Amino acid sequence: MQTNEGEVEEESSSQVEQEDFVMEGHGKTPPPGEESKQEKEQEREEQLMEDKKRKKEDKKKKEATQKVTEQKTKVPEVTKPSLSQPTAASPIGSSPSPPVNGGNNAKRVAVPNGQPPSAARYMPREVPPRFRCQQDHKVLLKRGQPPPPSCMLLGGGAGPPPCTAPGANPNNNAQVTGALLQSESGTAPESTLGGAAASNYANSTWGPGASSNSGASPNPIHIWDKVIVDGSDMEEWPCIASKDTESSSENTTDNNSASNPGSEKSSLPGSTTSNKGKGSQCQAASSGNECNLGVWKSDPKAKSVQPPNSTSDSNNGLGNWRSTSGQDRIGPGSGFSNFNPNSNPSAWPALVQEGTSRKGALETESSSSSAQVSTVGQASREQQSKMENAGVNFVVSGREQAQIHNTDGPKNGNTNSLNLSSPNPMENKGMPFGMGLGNTSRSTDAPSQSTGDRKTGSVGSWGAARGPSGTDTVSGQSNSGNNGNNGKDREDSWKGASVPKPTGSKSDSWDNNNRSTGGSWNFGPQDNNDNKWGEGNKMTSGVSQGEWKQPTGSDELKIGEWSGPNQPNSSTGAWDNQKGHPLPENQGNAQAPCWGRSSSSAGSEVGGQSTGSNHKAGSSDSHNSGRRSYRPTHPDCQAVLQTLLSRTDLDPRVLSNTGWGQTQIKQDTVWDIEEVPRPEGKSDKGTEGWESAATQTKNSGGWGDAPSQSNQMKSGWGELSASTEWKDPKSTGGWNDYKNNNSSNWGGGRADEKTPSSWNESSCKDQGWGGGRQPNQGWTSGKNGWGEEVDQVKNNNWESSANKPVSGWGEGGQNEIGTWGNGGNTNLASKGGWEDCKRSPAWNETGRQPNSWNKQHQQQQQPPPPQPEASGSWGGPPPPPQGNVRPSNSNWSSGPQPTTPKDDEPSGWEEPSPQSISRKMDIDDGTSAWGDPNSYNYKNVNLWDKNSQGGPAPREPNLPTPMTGKSASVWSKSTPPAPDNGTSAWGEPNESSPGWGEMDDAGASTTGWGNTPANAPNAMKPNSKSMQDGWGESDGPVTGARHPSWEEEDDGGVWNTAGSQGSTSSHNSASWGQGGKKQMKCSLKGGNNDSWMNPLAKQFSNMGLLSQTEDNPSSKMDLSVDKKFDVDKRTMNLGDFNDIMRKDRPGFRPPNSKDLGTTDSGPYFEKGGSHGLFGNSTAQSRGLHTPVQPLSSSPGLRAQVPPQFISPQVSASMLKQFPNSGLNPGLFNVGPQLSPQQIAMLSQLPQIPQFQLACQLLLQQQQQQQQLLQNQRKISQAVRQQQEQQLARMVSALQQQQQQQQQQQRQPSMKHSPSHPVGPKPHLDNMVPNALNVGLPDLPTKGPIPGYGSGFSSGGMDYGMVGGKEAGTESRFKQWTSMMEGLPSVATQEATMHKNGAIVAPGKTRGGSPYNQFDIIPGDTLGGHTGPAGDSWLPAKSPPTNKIGSKSSNASWPPEFQPGVPWKGIQNIDPESDPYVTPGSVLGGTTTSPIVDTDHQLLRDNTTGSNSSLNTSLPSPGAWPYSASDNSFTNVHSTSAKFPDYKSTWSPDPIGHNPTHLSNKMWKNHISSRNTTPLTRPPPGLTNPKPASPWSSTAPRSVRGWGTQDSRIASASTWSDGGSVRPSYWLVLHNLTPQIDGSTLRTICMQHGPLLTFHLNLTQGTALIRYSTKQEAAKAQTALHMCVLGNTTILAEFATEDEVSRFLAQAQPPTPAATPSAPATGWQSLETSQNQADPVGPALNLFGGSTGLGQWSSSAGGSSGADLAGTSLWGPPNYSSSLWGVPTVEDPHRMGSPAPLLPGDLLGGGSDSI
């Protein structure tokens, strides 16, 4: 007994360690006090423990040898591993053993050697060498502690004990365990059982696995083998073996735990069932569960005993789990394996993943069960994490709980399903898993159990929700069943599936499960819940499981998030790590840390692995399983990894992740795997991802997690939670809990988390979830979070509504969704819900646009960035839920269905800030969000930025998230308003409130924004259209053309591109683009151009160009190669760049802000980005300077403009480099024709740095252009051809270049260039000579430029040449300026431009960008000066003083930059004192956002005339062509006047960013002065049609949308802000009810000043008011905002011109074309007079102003006519409409068509129509 005592001690130590572990890793720990204690103890006892453990281990080894022969065999191995883990393992093992055996313990234990067999099987897949090491490492790291946790995982006790124990150990252990466990669990038997099982199992497999995974690593294999042998062990194993040999074994393998579980499970079931064999079989079926089972097997008995405990415990116990486990769980779970994995995702992915995870889980499970508690708990989190364990545990517990059959039995059928799996077990498992996983996550998730019950189903918490889904969760099977049940209720589905599932492959599993569902995820899908992933997968279906990743990838990103995509690997890994990691730690399950693990864990269970790390494995389902199906033996992790790595279909990103999951996660792999076969386990797992996630833990991490964490969440989902995790959170719900807490629930949490990231972080990110949900809608409607309210509400909502509503997210979710909904209760299910639902579509669906996450994401995607809400689309959509639209729903999957929940809405994910939310929701927040981002917490405003979020990036992940979070929320929120919220507009909002997301719906379009992208490329792709749509949603309206166009290009142009990477980048780009995501794919990846690229690459390679990526010159350039590359990267990945930019957003600074000028311009432009805002700006920002833009060869096109836009895209440094090379300008002629990918490739030709720069520039331009083109798909084909031709030209040029290069390089100017790039001056210098304008000019530098000049001349502008005049040698600036107006100011302008760096170029680019090809070409004059002009524009505005503020007046142009002379440019403007300063100028100008500056400059410049080019650019390259002509300039000038106003609008945007206030102030002043400028412009739209025309062009202007777009993007808030416009003459009152008396409202408004315009649109619930001064408007806004009038609370926001235009457009719902006129007219008068009267008017005019407005209007009308104006604004653009919108409509050709150019008429007439 000494040993026992020692064991006990060890166990205690283990526990302590575990706790410590928990504390450390999970945060979930016993009570805080305990935690502290544990910590202290840990420190104090660590050594002691280690020593004791060692001693004990030695003893145990001896005992083990003595005690159990089989075990003995196994023991040594175990022991060895255990050594690492040792004591812990042993004790647990030991303790658990007896309990396991309960009666049969000894025998059982022996049988559990079945476990060993399992283990043996597992081992291979479980521990790849690399992981092994890690595992070991971990163990070692932990030294004493980890082992204990491991042990705990394994058994709770020490690893050795297991050895020791099967026989004796069991007793001893039992005692010990009992003591420990009991204490902990309160169930000795369980503990023991768990231990035993764990022991055997764990020890064997787990032990080793866990333990070692490290120590056992090798052993594990042995063990595994043994296990397998044991598998033979008929008694227990037969079933399992047989059933599972595959199942079991596979499952087992799958689950590691599962397998083991299988055995164990058998036991479990057996125990429970009593019938080992039988149980076993069931288990086998379960197999996935198996783990559970296996574990349970032993456990079960104990469990049986425990059951109550379990139940209670479970609930409780589980709870305990939660409790114990919870804390312990964490500890242990994390305990060791997991922990390590967690900590060491990499380790775990493979190892843990499977093994550890599984094992741990199992063990844990066992333990859990047993100890469930402690051990388990202790065992850990890991175990728990394992989900399995948790699941299992839960299972057990749950099962027990339910007994689970029911438990999830609740699902009952589940049972059936499980049944097979021992229903219970399965169930358990599933459940547990669910629970565990989920629950676990829940922590206790027990919530399920514990939580309950609710959980019961909880189990799955997820479970529950998963509920049964939960079960599924884990098991998927059961879960499936359950889930199915749950969710589909269907146990059935699951169930059936389940059963088979267990064995089935993961995919299967899912499939099976889903089978019914059909879908793997389906499972989920099926259920929504399950959906879990599945669903989304739905399609993925089988894959689902595996899919996770896939979905992820595809779509889901989210999943991806989870799984791979997101982080992709990371995802899982991410989850794993990220989330999971923490999560796992937190949760045992979490472990799975990542998804992977999570999955793993969860997956493990069920394939958990699969998901989990496994993803690699396949489904995970076991790996094997996943890989499953057959594969009983899992392939070696290593092998799997290899496979994964070698897979071509995987997203490299996923694989590539280094961190986290490293590749390990294999999410992809797994996904890939899909294998279907066994539904098994995976099934439940189903979620594997979910599961894990669900499991939550991970999930939690994943979903859960986050929530749980929710709070924190930060981490990601899971991570944060981690402890919190579900569990912690107590989870309770994890979701719930989290929910609760978070309220946000996802949202909340997410929101909270902000992270959202987590999910999508990016997307989701809260986005989604959180915010998104927000609207709650959904999800949680319940306000609470998921849970809570959810429950009810949620439940209701979701469930209810959702629920069936399927609504739920799921839509599919059907219930699942319901689950979600249900989930409320089910919450879990819910989880699933989300998953499901969302997933359902979403996830996988990707497409689904449903938004799916992806969608959502997509939506969210960044564009949504804000999404969050949007992502929320979820949320948002939800709003739409309004019914709105399914889209919304769609979004949700319909989930929005929940729209219904609209009620819920309030809580909405977003909820976090209910108030806001509600407000938001209620109100038209779209705008509000926009306008008042502040109001909303949700970061909102920036929405964009937020979105940027970070992206989802998960990349950034989820960076976006943040935004998302709030933002998302915002979006979401906005969404809620659904009404149109501006978001709507966004969404257009489609219904959308979803806004972005909504879009989603749209078709998935969804996601318009990003969504698609989010979806990832996949989604994107498919979606892409959608996405595009998304934009448009509008897309729709807008056109698909446009969108598609946008999207279309794969690149999505910026969109995509940005999105692509940008997913994160998102931010804007991404966001917008998110689509960007696509980009990624597109971009370097080649996207669509890939094919050409390869040959091209080959050619270059042959030429020797390719290899020398970095050129000496480059090096020379002051830009370092790395930097250059970075730049390239950025440029390539617009998204990324964008991201950066976006982040800088405020400044709109490209990453290379330093290149202030350039950057500034870029960013601002970015805003304006001709591209569409979105793309363009993105591109721009991204590109920074993309003078190259001139890509487009046709000069007529707004080449001039685009360059401006482009310039910004390229970083100055890049430019610098570029010049070094002296490339042949001719190369750049490729300009627009080349695809970004091509360009990117070209840019890699090292020999010619300049070339590279040029390529980058071109790439950026093209991206922008492509976006535009995509908008106008028609063009794209031709463009593509052109690109190819140009590419060919470029190649030949390169060849020449190589020859010429050195000479050129020698040219001083060239060298000078580098300098230029750095500073605006250099740029200027270069520009002047090069006429590259802005950054680009630098590239060519004088020497090269001439070449360019010749080469570029018309097409040539290419670089930034913008053709400009092709002056070649003559300074572009000069040329441009002369062109502009021949005004001297031009020079200044150029200087300004230079100052801004590439700003001008960006401006050009921007303008031209969208239509880059058109514009780019020098747009001759325009083009030529475009860059500069653009840049200048900003500067131009400022007086000659060089202040940005200077008006466009010619005199104002900043001095031209002279290479040797410091450029005085526009620096140091005192916004306060400088009358010429405009907000934009200020922002863009010296300070922060060059972009802004640029914008302003553009605007001003417009005034100047020079600006006109910019203007055009901004407005629309289309205009440029005309604009290009002098007349255009003139027009521009006219426009200019408008521009300023416009600008003001923009300004606000910028203002929003940055110095918004300054800008505003400036604006105020400026505007006046600008107004003065009016001389240039006739009354805005009216007087000069031409100007209008530019705007007409405006389509581009639309782009101007930059404003919009950018604004939106840059700041949604900006818009919002901007919307608020900070000081804008226009106020948009939202949330008006039809009962409001217009006259009263008008009277109230008049109290603050004379109303130039009062446009009441009660149908939109909005009123557009224009004051004569911004001050009045500001005063009115302050007074009116949140003012309670009648039965509503008015939201007053400043409206930007764009918004106004939209508003008007909406107001006049005439056809878009017509609208413009109508609105235009309406506007016109409005605007006109206003314009004349007030600069703002003109600005409006600009925008709206005649053209602009009209356009906007129109677009708005079209797209968003309905949209709120303000919102609408956003919406409308939808870009499609408005922004792009109108043009959109014609966007595709808008450029080409003069119509846009149409003037002012626009207002009156129809710029749109024109």
From Swiss-Prot:
It comes from Mus musculus (Mouse). The modification Phosphothreonine is found at residues 1426, 1441. Residues 180-190, 261-290, 306-327, 438-451, 504-528, 564-575, 611-623, 655-667, 774-783, 793-804, 846-857, 934-950, 964-975, 1004-1027, 1057-1072, 1175-1195, 1604-1617, 1722-1733 have a biased composition (Polar residues). Residues 1625-1697 form the RRM domain. The keyword Metal-binding does not apply. It comes from the Eukaryota. SUPFAM superfamilies: RNA-binding domain, RBD. One of its GO terms (molecular function) is RNA binding. It is found in: Cytoplasm, P-body. The gene is Tnrc6b. Residues 37-1028 are annotated as: Interaction with argonaute proteins. One of its GO terms (biological process) is miRNA-mediated gene silencing by inhibition of translation. Residues 1-22 have a biased composition (Acidic residues). Residues 34-52, 60-77, 123-139, 675-688 have a biased composition (Basic and acidic residues). GO terms for cellular component: cytosol; P-body. Keywords: Coiled coil, Cytoplasm, Phosphoprotein, RNA-binding, RNA-mediated gene silencing, Translation regulation. Residues 809-824 have a biased composition (Gly residues). Residues 1449-1467 are annotated as: PABPC1-interacting motif-2 (PAM2). Residues 1191-1700 are annotated as: Silencing domain. Residues 88-106, 165-174, 207-220, 248-260, 335-346, 363-380, 416-425, 475-486, 1295-1307, 1792-1801 have a biased composition (Low complexity). This is Trinucleotide repeat-containing gene 6B protein. Belongs to the GW182 family. Plays a role in RNA-mediated gene silencing by both micro-RNAs (miRNAs) and short interfering RNAs (siRNAs). Required for miRNA-dependent translational repression and siRNA-dependent endonucleolytic cleavage of complementary mRNAs by argonaute family proteins. As scaffolding protein associates with argonaute proteins bound to partially complementary mRNAs and simultaneously can recruit CCR4-NOT and PAN deadenylase complexes.
